[in-house]
Amino acid sequence: MSIVGFISSYQLDIMLFLSGICAIMTVMTAMTKSLAPSRRRVLALLELAAVLLLMFDRFAYLYRGDASVTGYWVVRISNFMVYYLTLYLLHEVTLYLIDLYSGKGIQQNFLRRLRFCELLFVAGTVLLVVSQFTGLYYSFDENNLYHRAPGNFICFLIPLAISFLQISVVVQYRKYLSRPVVISLMLNAVVPIIASIIQLFVYGVSLTNISIVGMVIILHLNALVDLNEEVEHARQTEITVYKEARKKEHDLFKQTVGALVNAIEAKDTYTNGHSHRVAMYSERIARRAGKSDEFC
């Protein structure tokens, strides 16, 4: 059995499984305090959109061919939401990129491309709404079965353009991000593109949607890896600063004690330098006794 055949046979179960994983990740992300509020919000919405995408896609398949009133509305609402959520996920990835590059000290030229991604998102949403009344993207027959329209390729071109713009930003400014994040962002853009190309020639299999959600899961995992690296770096920096502060405090204490001893000994010619000689002899005795440098 081919991969496409396997997905076609078990895609409803795969959708349910992946949506459950994304639902758990949504709750975990919302509860995570280590992430910045803006990044936590973007990731949580991204994962929630992935859950809804698979659930609506699943409903579209379950009620396909159901000519009842319920089937009529479920199929139409589900297909509309599948198309919209595909665009919305790319919109959230754009916001995620903006958040990642904010505060990196780079020029704002990349924002022009990401803003254009947002314009494409709005344009795609408007065309999707228009298609509901004109049949630009798809239509339904009397048996409530979905059929692609000649203009269906447009709904593939817009996400494709957004993905290429996102890839160009990631490639150009990859040195500002960690390796796991760069890899996950590239996969998040490239894998759905490949799936979309296959989807053009294969009907009845949600390769694109399943691949998108799979990449969202990978994006989440790599975001956690990046977060752990940032926390570890911050911890090491804090330890270094603490050690330097302790060393400065110790040096200051030695200088203060030395100044006090010198001031006291300066009052009497006999005791002048006495404390220094005692300390020197004590160090020699300790070294001959085999004590460590730290002890001495």
Show where each model-derived region lies.
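Hydrophobic transmembrane alpha-helical segments in integral membrane proteins
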Residues: 1-24, 152
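Short aromatic-rich membrane-water interface segments that cap or initiate transmembrane helices
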Residues: 5-9, 73-85, 144-156
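Hydrophobic alpha-helical transmembrane segments of multi-pass membrane proteins
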Residues: 13-96, 117-133, 185-200
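Alpha-helical transmembrane segments in multipass membrane proteins, preferentially the mid-helix core
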Residues: 23-29, 92-96, 156-176
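Membrane-interface helix-boundary motifs at transmembrane edges
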Residues: 29-44, 99-114, 170-181
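Membrane-proximal helix-loop-helix units in multi-pass membrane proteins
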Residues: 92-95, 100-160
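Interfacial "cap-and-anchor" motif at the non-cytosolic start of specific transmembrane alpha-helices
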Residues: 169-241
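Acidic/His-rich, divalent-metal-binding segments that scaffold phosphate/diphosphate chemistry
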Residues: 237-296
